[in-house]
Amino acid sequence: VYLKDIVERKKIKRLDILEATLDLLCSSVGSLTNPNNVAKAMNSKQKLSGEDLVSNNTVTSYMDHLADAYLFEECKRYDVKGKNYFDYPNKYYCEDIGLRNARIGFRQQELTHIMENIIYNDLRIRGCEVDIGVVYATEKSKAGNNVQVAREIDFIANHGGKKTYIQYL
């Protein structure tokens, strides 16, 4: 029903690509992704080439349509020290975990990703603006050199001018 509404309202011509985009997003909740990765995965899985290739623009448009239909929400990554947002990759969370599970046939029950999605939804229900935090740290490599590594803060919840940093695992 929800896909039919999107197809009618947005005049979607390629239902197969919309469904594949939905399936890939359902399978990757809580993982960093972007339209380019989704398009590459679709083209590779379906062995598409030439004019049949799914473009990044098409995937971006379809991801936007899924978000407009309240099926997914994009959560941006935020550089805590640099105080700016990254363009890509971001995370996408299902607005309804039950729909996500039904869509992918109740397989892929990665509890950490599902729990992350549930926590994200709870924070949003409580009225928080939510970002994924990124902090850079210096660590020693195996060769003994200092290297910069990005560390993730699961959530930065902003509510009423107050920031709360949440690391659940």
Language model region names:
Residues 1-163:
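Accessory nucleic acid-recognition modules appended to NTPase machines
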